[in-house]
Amino acid sequence: MADVVVGIQWGDEGKGKIVDRIAKDYDFVVRYQGGHNAGHTIVHKGVKHSLHLMPSGVLYPKCKNIISSAVVVSVKDLCEEISAFEDLENRLFVSDRAHVILPYHAKKDAFKEKSQNIGTTKKGIGPCYEDKMARSGIRMGDLLDDKILEEKLNAHFKAIEPFKKAYDLGENYEKDLMGYFKTYAPKICPFIKDTTSMLIEANQKGEKILLEGAQGTLLDIDLGTYPFVTSSNTTSASACVSTGLNPKAINEVIGITKAYSTRVGNGPFPSEDTTPMGDHLRTKGAEFGTTTKRPRRCGWLDLVALKYACALNGCTQLALMKLDVLDGIDAIKVCVAYERKGERLEIFPSDLKDCVPIYQTFKGWEKSVGVRKLDDLEPNVREYIRFIEKEVGVKIRLISTSPEREDTIFL
């Protein structure tokens, strides 16, 4: 059976810590979408690990880690991540169906961002998915056969010839890309496998599989705040499509949310706080992107968005992250509805334009940091937790009270 960990906000919810905390109980940890535009930060024994492509189970020696078919892979960045770990043989597997991000994709991404102003990371994620959908992409499995790779690259060179100048690819792009693959392909090829068959077999054997998403539900290409979204499907349903596991294999869906809200880049954010309180949340919560180091926009918990995300994913339980960031705040707001042109909205709309948050205010608390038992939390904290559970209709089973792995309350 497989369990899914999915972010139910705009990403950066703390999925990495949760996966790291529970990965020891699983045989496989699988990253199922996105690329190196995402980032997980894990603190283990006082050491901070920043992961962008690697599944969060790499810190457990007995855990097998898979990068599945819907992930887009920068071979250079993956090689750099691999070099930071030891003994990954037979512990890391990259799907032969996953698509390869080329330097061209990053150049195209940066070029398009100038006019679209979406707030992308300019890592080439979107353009790589574009080529995938156009059936012209290069897959990881192509790296295993020099002849096939050469054919794919020649087709790529022909296709991009009219755009070389616009995307500033340089006169030696073809030669440089050939050298790029000669450098990195030998390092990555030993990890390329048919991971779909591996996971189907593992599920049939009854092995435990944890499926790890990147970004968050509200960034889903179809169901998020379009066009300010990522280029992949980020909900739990996409875990099946990417891995080859059928829906019957899914057991628990664990939705991850912060005790407040954040967003990176442009796009609507009804509960954003642009006062000094937003700055306080950013500073105390260290809200700066793992990948881009960009400051995250911060605000209050949005229950309209949270209920929507829980429904989309079929969440069976929640993990509440960064509760300690709210310590010491006298009055804590929660968005319970929107108002738009005089109308009260309690259902998340497809367009958030003109939506103004309607807040309910709670009394704050002094300290929750480092607490590991529910009974040790102050009454006002417990009231806040109960209210979230009641409004969303899903039980909170895990609460994080600091970045440390051990500072976690299990319910």
Swiss-Prot record:
HAMAP family: Adenylosucc_synth. Substrate binds at T290, T291, T292, K293, R294, P295, R296. The keyword GTP-binding applies. SMART domains: Adenylsucc_synt (SM00788). Its EC number is 6.3.4.4. GO terms for molecular function: adenylosuccinate synthase activity; GTP binding; magnesium ion binding. Mg(2+) binds at D12, G39. GTP binds at residues 11-17, 39-41, 296, 322-324, 400-402. Keywords: Cytoplasm, GTP-binding, Ligase, Magnesium, Metal-binding, Nucleotide-binding, Purine biosynthesis. This is Adenylosuccinate synthetase. It catalyses: IMP + L-aspartate + GTP = N(6)-(1,2-dicarboxyethyl)-AMP + GDP + phosphate + 2 H(+). Belongs to the adenylosuccinate synthetase family. It holds the Pfam family Adenylsucc_synt. It comes from Helicobacter pylori (strain ATCC 700392 / 26695) (Campylobacter pylori). One of its GO terms (biological process) is 'de novo' AMP biosynthetic process. IMP binds at D12, E13, G14, K15, N37, A38, G39, H40, T121, R135, Q215, T230, R294.
